[in-house]
């Protein structure tokens, strides 16, 4: 009998303990699907499209650069 066999237990390994850890709550004001303690049920949150203002601004900047390059 080897030393390895001597150190092994005869019974089955017990299952690992169940973890009671939960994730931290979301930041204040962050919309969730679950109502919090004592909160009033709110309607569905709708998002609004911000449009393509970023792309229009980039195109305007490129046009200005090209116009300045041509003029000077």
Curated annotation (Swiss-Prot):
Any coiled-coil regions, as ranges: none
Region described as Disordered:
1-46
What's the chief localization of this chain? membrane
Question: Transmembrane ranges?
Answer: 49-65
Q: Bias regions of kind Polar residues — which residues?
A: 1-11
- For this entry, the protein name equals Protein CYSTEINE-RICH TRANSMEMBRANE MODULE 1
Q: Specify whether Plastid is a keyword of the entry.
A: no
Gene encoding it? CYSTM1
Instruction: Name the family the entry cites.
Output: Belongs to the CYSTM1 family.
Q: How does it sit in the membrane?
A: Single-pass membrane protein
Its biological purpose is as follows: May be involved in aluminium (Al) tolerance. Involved in resistance to abiotic stress.
Q: Which organism is it from?
A: Arabidopsis thaliana (Mouse-ear cress)
Locate the compositionally biased regions of type Pro residues. 13-29
| Assembly with partners or alone | Heterodimers. Binds weakly to CYSTM7 and WIH1/CYSTM13.
Q: Which GO terms describe its cellular component?
A: cytoplasm; nucleus; plasma membrane
Induction, per UniProt: Induced by drought and oxidation stress.
Q: Does the keyword Cell inner membrane apply?
A: no
What InterPro entries does the entry give? Answer: CYSTM_dom, WIH1-like
Report the domain of life of the source organism: Eukaryota
Any idea where this protein resides?
Cell membrane; Nucleus
Q: Which UniProt keywords apply?
A: Cell membrane, Membrane, Nucleus, Transmembrane, Transmembrane helix
User: Hey, what tissues is this thing expressed in?
Assistant: Mostly expressed in roots, flowers and siliques and, to a lower extent, in stems and leaves.
């Amino acid at each position: 009998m080897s030393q390895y066999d001597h150190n092994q237990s005869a019974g089955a390994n017990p299952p690992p303990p169940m973890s009671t850890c939960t994730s931290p709550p979301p930041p204040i004001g962050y919309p969730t699907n679950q109502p919090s303690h004592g909160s009033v049920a709110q309607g569905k949150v709708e998002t609004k499209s911000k449009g393509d203002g970023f792309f229009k601004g980039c195109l305007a900047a490129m046009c200005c650069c090209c116009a300045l390059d041509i003029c000077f």
